[in-house]
């Protein structure tokens, strides 16, 4: 009897798992596009922000030269987390299971496979959050891995959208003017800025300024509201609104490197200024595996059993690339 799960069953399981919370990915890259080829194709089209020319009603309309469109393709590296279904665990009571055990070994096996799939999903989404952070910080993403040549995908964000405050303008200095900085960034972005995302160091510097405190002092009588209390342990925290629609968030998301060191997605004293106008999507190349049926999908889970020695495996494959349609709608600033 074949005890392997078919693709559709595993896809249904992984799709029904409780979602793993991402922040940057969810905020700036909400869309999903799946490709039926292993390569991702995308057009780099610069939005034409020129004014329509005024002409006399008696003069023929003026033809405006179409901006060029560049087709590029990229074959992303596979993410392939893989785990063994430990046969010893099927005989051990699971957390929350009644003393004496109410689950059969087969039921525990199913639960273990679901746990593994949930972990795979988290690991893949955490990698994509890291890719989203790179794109927002630099306008580029570096893709590298075992047996995969290091490649840099450049989305051609304007160099001026990656900034570093210097000298007396740094928020660590008493001479800085953070609200003036925010106004300047808003003028520089391709689209209106509606969100400021700060790491905790940048936010701590931001709220200590008198000009910011004046807004805080008048927050009950104005539309400027900022929460100055400590975070409650969440990886992201809404701090309030400046003016009518500029949301302020603190983000403390992180991952661990191979040495188990904690690495924040946003370096210390970083601010991301942007909005939904980034219009990012999560693109997925097809997984070239006959078991997947050569279908377009975000994640392809599979399991199989080697007979000698008898070992059961669960693996999830994905070939993702976050793509910002409008990279100049976001800026990254080192403020101290």
Task: State the predicted function of each range.
Residues 213-336:
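Sequence/fold signature of self-assembling virion shell proteins
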Residues 30-99:
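Assembly/oligomerization interface modules of large self-assembling protein complexes
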Residues 65-69, 137, 144, 220-224:
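Glycine-rich loops and low-complexity Gly/Arg-rich segments
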Residues 31-33, 186-190, 195, 303-306, ...:
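A general structural signal for short secondary-structure junctions and capping/turn motifs
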Residues 1-41, 325-336:
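N-terminal alpha-helical "arm" segments
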Residues 149-225:
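Extended, solvent-exposed, turn-rich assembly/linker loops in the middle of proteins
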Residues 27-47, 115-150, 277-294:
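Contiguous N-terminal and early-domain "leader" segments and peripheral loops that mark the onset or edge
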Residues 81-157, 181, 186-202, 310-318:
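Long, contiguous amphipathic alpha-helices that act as assembly "spine/axial" helices in icosahedral shell
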